[in-house]
């Protein structure tokens, strides 16, 4: 096998190991995944949620339509979708199977529960300016 073929096969193998299917834009989906995972760990639906994320994620998600939510947009919608309809076992396809009745539940959750979004400040990230 030629060196170029070995390199090619190595790259293909890395891609097979590292790439995972995702439903829509990965940043809101990542928030849905985290929210779904948190709900699973808590063992109940939380009545309030604090989301501390980097300014870049805030900027990239605040106006994005969250898949399978009938046009809901933004961080809060992504989090609520994960809490109400997410399946954390599906990782980045966490909200691929949202049912119509769950969309109403997501909207109700957004209306009646508190989701606070704050810029995350760490030594690595620094102060976010949003």
What are these regions (language model features)?
Residues 2, 6-10, 26-33, 70-74, ...:
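Conserved active-site and cofactor/substrate-binding residues in soluble primary-metabolism enzymes
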Residues 28-44:
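Alpha-helical support elements that line or immediately flank enzyme active sites
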Residues 10-23:
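Generic N-terminal amphipathic, Lys/Arg-enriched alpha-helix
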Residues 21-24, 65, 69, 93-96:
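Hydrophobic alpha-helical scaffolding
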Residues 128-130:
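Conserved small/polar residues in nucleotide/adenosyl-binding loops
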Residues 47-89, 103-115:
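A structural-propensity feature for long, helix-poor, extended segments
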Residues 115-117, 125-126:
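C-terminal binding/interaction regions
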Residues 1-12, 45-59:
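Acidic-glycine-rich active-site phosphate/pyrophosphate-binding loop
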